[in-house]
């Protein structure tokens, strides 16, 4: 079973999935909508769950370096509450601090228009990699 990483945005939401072994993550897609609508994003997630056999969802949580919440933090927390009502899977937060900065650095050579279309799925990949490397692997070692 695979993991799904999400970089949630009001307009653009990036998705990434793990490979079958949960060792690496791959950018999947960027979902674009005209305004923030949880239902549209949840429908997109349900499609991904059916297609890729997902067993865990990881959402990037934007927290300032001093652990202070922002409007974006509250938006993401509210989304998780809505998602939990619709989907019966474990859902984790991963601090996404700097994921967009790292994503932009990794695609720095691309033209700005193309970069805008993929930065969110690269951010989702970074979020999912963080989970796989720091949480999921630790959990596996703790079981043995």
Curated annotation (Swiss-Prot):
Organism: Mycoplasma mobile (strain ATCC 43663 / 163K / NCTC 11711) (Mesomycoplasma mobile)
Alphabetical GO biological process terms: rRNA 5'-end processing
Keyword tags: Cytoplasm, Hydrolase, Nuclease, Ribosome biogenesis
InterPro entries, alphabetized: RNaseH-like_sf (IPR012337), YqgF (IPR005227), YqgF/RNaseH-like_dom (IPR006641), YqgF/RNaseH-like_dom_sf (IPR037027)
Major place of residence: cytoplasm
Keyword set includes Hydrolase: yes
Location(s), subcellular: Cytoplasm
Family statement drawn from the similarity comment of this UniProt entry: Belongs to the YqgF nuclease family.
Protein name: Putative pre-16S rRNA nuclease
HAMAP family for the chain: Nuclease_YqgF (MF_00651)
Cellular component annotations (GO), alphabetically ordered: cytosol
Main function: Could be a nuclease involved in processing of the 5'-end of pre-16S rRNA.
Documented EC number(s): 3.1.-.-
GO terms for MF: nuclease activity
